[in-house]
Swiss-Prot record:
It comes from Fervidobacterium nodosum (strain ATCC 35602 / DSM 5306 / Rt17-B1). The gene is lon. The keyword Cytoplasm applies. Signal peptide: none annotated. ATP-dependent serine protease that mediates the selective degradation of mutant and abnormal proteins as well as certain short-lived regulatory proteins. Required for cellular homeostasis and for survival from DNA damage and developmental changes induced by stress. Degrades polypeptides processively to yield small peptide fragments that are 5 to 10 amino acids long. Binds to DNA in a double-stranded, site-specific manner. Keywords: ATP-binding, Cytoplasm, Hydrolase, Nucleotide-binding, Protease, Serine protease, Stress response. Its EC number is 3.4.21.53. GO terms for cellular component: cytoplasm. It is found in: Cytoplasm. The lineage of its organism: Bacteria, Thermotogati, Thermotogota, Thermotogae, Thermotogales. This is Lon protease. Belongs to the peptidase S16 family. Pfam families: AAA (PF00004), Lon_C (PF05362), Lon_lid (PF22667), LON_substr_bdg (PF02190). Residues 32-226 form the Lon N-terminal domain.
Length: 810
């Protein structure tokens, strides 16, 4: 293949030959040399454009056209301009037949070629070897000059005029090319060459043969580009106006500042007011110093500077915090006790603790406020008790929910360097309440999380520590603030999710689930009167409750530790009773039968008490978040080889209790019953298999069931038991005694076996229940078996300590 240096002589005469070819009649051969274009330009018929030729294959095609095809060459675009040595697959199928008008050589050995587009054509196949040489087919179409074509030409011309108004790419005089053109095909090609768009869109226009279709596509492209240019111009205008406005404001502000300086430095009204506020109020000295420093910064800034807004916001915060303002605590202990009892029934321990604090404050103003944590199941009144405490103490009340909190800045605030920085929620509450000694409830403290944004539980360590919160520093405020007079009350459902360091700073008061007796009293004296007070007319003329109806709702329609569901069910009954009263015009007395009518069948499907003593079946007691419940343990022997089968969806701890109970049972029964363990499999099952169960407190119950099934002795059905066991047969204390005793009482079981060390917990059981119960306190499993497996069910145990539940019995 020849190179550029070899062809210097040949191309020196190209310009002369081009001039000669223009004077001759155009004749288009069927086979033409082809130049592959890799610029972003598409040559259309009926247009005159220049382009550059530099590659060897293009120079050879140009030479071929000048010498053999009467200066006619086929120009086709590459699909990818980056391809240096293209093949047929790199080219579009449709190109333009052009006539060479002029060829000029450039200093860099490339040639500038001026051509005139003659016709659009598509190549059939390549017959060249060293360069592209295509068999071509000219693309023609027949059309008449219809009104539609004339309208399209007019619309394209108008749209081009619009485009030229917004774009600087096309000189206005260029549109003169279209003024005298009445041939639609020529008009469409010239318009296409002026039309904006990328290489793909231009190639599509070239491939559209019919002028009407070509004009429609040109119209679409022009309309789109004109709209975009119009939007760009509008945006540019807005930006320009803003810049001019900003410059004008800056000029006027500077001018005003100079005038003020000349007149003797007259202070800004806002700054003057801030200075007066600092001097006229009793702020701590360190607050005044900080405020003065910030005001000095503000004076040196432009009033409209972004930093000035940050300083103003900061000054607003530190000057509006209650540095000294506080409410006076009530010194009437009887009044405080009355308020607490009005709002809540029971809850003696938290009430007593608040009254103790008030009594201490009455004689010593230096008494530190306790950090109280109420722990208990949902709905038992933890949050509402905190509100009552504030009312009883004559303090303002604020609540902050910690559930799901993961960002430390929610407690400590953001540093002022951050955009949109704000103080933490503790300081926000203090400012909102306007006093430095409110009651603040930190709700759901057990449900905080940890994330990459920090650990909010660790941030609370300073807040809830009486030794540190005297000088609590919020990241935004940056000044020490005394939180020691704030009474913090926290609530939680469980303790184990609270970090030990945080738990150690709080005085934990457990609020257990309400008993049925307490629920009845609350429903009768709190819930129903509250509902009645919401009626416009006298509620006692519309409905009334029988005590038996309230008890039916408690026992058969609610199973919860608190009273939220109980209130919902009572409200449902009241709504239906009110509707009946309005329809009939008579007062509705709500009886148990009416409860069934209004609420439907019983929602609580509780298993009945065992009808008679049974072999291998014992009644245990369990604690759940909804209160206490009875738990039946079943065991049986089946032929086998000493295996153990455990069913009932038991957790790992309870499974371990079963294995301990089995080992202990084998030890208790001795060699006399050894064959029963080796020739049988033992199956232990806890009914209600869909409910997960876990914990060690069923140890004595399982052991009793196993000994019963091996010895073939029935277990008394009038006794319930709870307690953890060891391999030595010791009975260890367990939790939830109050709830478990109440569960036995509800079931009609009035004799309960408990660990000896749980005897002190009996005092927590309501006296009305305690006096009706009999408790046997045991230290070993043998004492349990003496009572539970006594063949004479009426015979009292000779071992273990048994007493009636009178609170005075010791």
């Amino acid at each position: 293949m020849p190179n550029k240096n070899d062809n210097k002589g040949k191309y020196s005469r190209l310009e002369k030959e081009a001039k000669k070819a223009r004077e001759e009649k155009i004749s288009i051969p069927n086979v033409l040399p082809a130049i592959a274009m890799r610029s972003n330009m598409v040559i259309f018929p009926n247009t005159v454009v220049p382009f550059y030729v530099g590659r060897e294959i293009s120079l050879m095609a140009l030479e071929e056209a000048m010498e053999k095809t009467n200066q006619i060459v086929f120009v086709v675009n590459q699909k990818d301009p980056a391809v240096e040595t293209p093949t047929e697959k790199d080219l579009y199928k449709v190109g333009t037949i052009v006539r060479i008008i002029q060829v000029g050589k450039l200093p860099d050995e490339t040639f500038k070629v001026l051509v005139e587009g003659i016709a659009r054509a598509k190549w059939i196949k390549n017959v060249g070897e060293k360069f592209f040489k295509f068999e071509i087919e000219i693309l023609r179409t027949r059309y008449g000059k219809s009104k539609r074509l004339i309208a399209l030409m007019r619309m394209v011309k108008e749209e081009l005029h619009k485009y030229v108004q917004y774009s600087r790419k096309i000189p206005p005089e260029t549109l003169m090319l279209l003024e005298d053109v009445d041939n639609p095909d020529v008009f469409a090609d010239i318009a296409a060459s002026l039309c904006p768009g990328n290489i793909e869109e231009k190639q599509q226009l070239l491939e559209i043969v019919h002028p009407a279709n070509r004009l429609e596509r040109i119209l679409d492209i022009l309309a789109r580009e004109t709209e975009l240019l119009e939007i760009e111009q509008q945006l540019d205008q807005k930006v320009k106006e803003r810049i001019e406005k900003s410059q004008r404001e800056y000029y006027l502000r500077e001018k005003l500042r100079v005038i003020r300086d000349e007149l003797g430095g007259e202070e800004d009204i806002e700054i003057k007011e801030l200075k007066e506020k600092i001097e006229n109020n009793n702020y701590p000295e360190f607050v005044k110093e900080k405020a003065r420093a910030e005001i000095n910064r503000l004076e040196k800034m432009s009033p409209y500077a972004p930093e000035a807004t940050v300083v103003r916001t900061y000054l607003d915060w530190i000057l509006n915090l209650p540095w000294h303002e506080k409410t006076d605590d009530t010194d009437d202990i009887n009044f405080a006790e009355k308020v607490l009892n009005e709002d809540h029934y029971g809850l003696d321990e938290p009430k007593r603790r608040i009254l103790e604090y008030l009594a201490t404050r009455k004689v010593s103003q230096k008494a530190k406020a306790p950090i109280i944590c109420f722990v208990g199941p949902p709905g038992v009144g933890k949050t509402s008790l905190a509100k009552s405490i504030a009312r009883a103490m004559n303090r303002k009340f604020g609540r902050m929910s910690l559930g799901g909190l993961r960002d430390e800045a929610e407690i400590r605030g953001h540093r002022r360097t951050y955009v949109g920085a704000m103080p933490g929620r503790i300081m926000q509450l203090i400012r909102k309440l306007g006093v430095k000694n409110p009651v603040i409830l930190l709700d759901e403290i057990d449900k905080m999380g940890i994330s990459f944004q920090g650990d909010p539980a660790s941030a609370l360590l300073e807040v809830l520590d009486p030794e540190q919160n005297k000088e609590f520093v919020d990241h935004y405020i940056e000044l020490p603030y005394d939180l020691s007079e704030v009474l913090f009350v926290t609530t939680a459902n469980v303790l184990y999710t609270i970090p030990p360091a945080l738990r150690d700073r709080m005085e934990v008061i457990e609020i257990s689930s309400y008993t049925d007796v307490e629920k009845f009293y609350i429903a009768k004296n709190y819930i129903i009167p509250k509902i009645e007070s919401e009626f416009v007319e006298k509620a006692d003329e519309i409905f009334s409750f029988k005590d038996t109806a309230i008890k039916k709702i408690i026992n058969e329609y609610t199973l919860e530790p608190g009273v939220r569901e109980l209130e919902r069910e009572i409200r449902s009954v009241v709504r239906k009773a009110t509707l009946d009263a309005i329809k009939t015009g008579k007062k509705i007395v709500i009886s148990p039968e009416k409860v069934t009518e209004y609420l439907g069948p019983s929602k609580i499907k509780d298993e009945d008490k065992l009808e008679k003593p049974m072999i291998g079946v014992t009644t245990g007691l369990a604690w759940t978040p909804n209160g206490g419940t009875t738990l039946y343990i079943e065991s049986t022997l089946i032929p086998g080889n000493g295996g153990l089968i455990i069913t009932g969806q038991l957790g790992d701890v309870m499974k371990e209790s079963v294995r301990i109970a089995l080992s202990l049972a084998r030890k208790i029964v001795g060699d006399e019953y050894a064959e029963k363990f080796t020739k049988n499999d033992i199956h232990v099952h806890v009914p209600e298999g869909a409910v997960p169960k876990d914990g060690p407190s069923a140890g004595v119950t399982i052991t009793t069931a196993l000994v019963s099934v091996v010895k073939n002795i029935p277990v008394r059905n009038d006794i319930a038991m709870t307690g953890e066991i060891t391999l030595r047969g010791r009975v260890l204390p367990v939790g939830g005694i109050k709830e478990k005793v109440m569960a036995a009482y509800r079931k009609g079981i009035y004799h309960v076996i408990l660990p000896k060390k749980n005897e002190v917990d009996i005092e927590k059981v309501p006296e009305v229940v305690r006096t009706k119960m009999k408790f046997t306190f045991v230290e070993t499993i043998e004492e349990v078996l003496e009572v539970a497996l006594n063949e004479d069910n009426s015979k009292e145990s000779r071992k273990g300590r048994t007493r009636k539940g009178n609170s005075n019995t010791k």
